[in-house]
Amino acid sequence: MAKKITGYVKLQVPAGSANPAPPIGPALGQRGLNIMEFCKAFNAQTAQLEKGMPIPVVITAYQDRSFTFELKTPPVSYFLKKAAGLDTKKKPGSGSKTPGKGATVGKVTRAQLAEIAEKKMKDLNCDNVASAVQMLEGSARSMGLQVEG
């Protein structure tokens, strides 16, 4: 018989640096899950990734207080800032203060967007790379990035 699921916890944790401090500790503690067990398992799975890269994770909590977790690909904003040469250590999604008003903070090419689309394809809600690139173009413009090519 399958275990009964009691809930899901969605977090965005820097790769290789999960620790019991907020936001991880309180989120898992509310569900009665072993915080250190998650931190060790997460850090082991993300050891090969760039340290500090924001990794979305979905934790499934079961009635017997066990859990499983699934790693997603980093947010689009992280890849766009990296492609444009911006500081990726700032909070996720930060770009231009006034996007679309003429002030751009960087430039990305369609080739870079296609490369990002290939990486993000499994997490995006689209069928082909061309539509994924269009979604990424919109995200880039809303961040204040200029799309070239």
UniProtKB/Swiss-Prot annotation:
Pfam families according to UniProt: Ribosomal_L11, Ribosomal_L11_N
InterPro entries: Ribosomal_uL11, Ribosomal_uL11_bac-typ, Ribosomal_uL11_C, Ribosomal_uL11_C_sf, Ribosomal_uL11_N, Ribosomal_uL11_N_sf
PTM: One or more lysine residues are methylated.
Keyword Nucleus included in the entry's annotation: no
Keyword rRNA-binding: yes
Cellular component terms (Gene Ontology): cytosolic large ribosomal subunit
GO biological process, alphabetically ordered: translation
Molecular-function GO terms, alphabetical: large ribosomal subunit rRNA binding; structural constituent of ribosome
Keywords noted in UniProt: Methylation, Ribonucleoprotein, Ribosomal protein, RNA-binding, rRNA-binding
Function recorded in the entry: Forms part of the ribosomal stalk which helps the ribosome interact with GTP-bound translation factors.
Known partners and oligomeric status: Part of the ribosomal stalk of the 50S ribosomal subunit. Interacts with L10 and the large rRNA to form the base of the stalk. L10 forms an elongated spine to which L12 dimers bind in a sequential fashion forming a multimeric L10(L12)X complex.
Family: Belongs to the universal ribosomal protein uL11 family.
Protein name as annotated: Large ribosomal subunit protein uL11
Organism name: Azorhizobium caulinodans (strain ATCC 43989 / DSM 5975 / JCM 20966 / LMG 6465 / NBRC 14845 / NCIMB 13405 / ORS 571)
Annotated gene: rplK
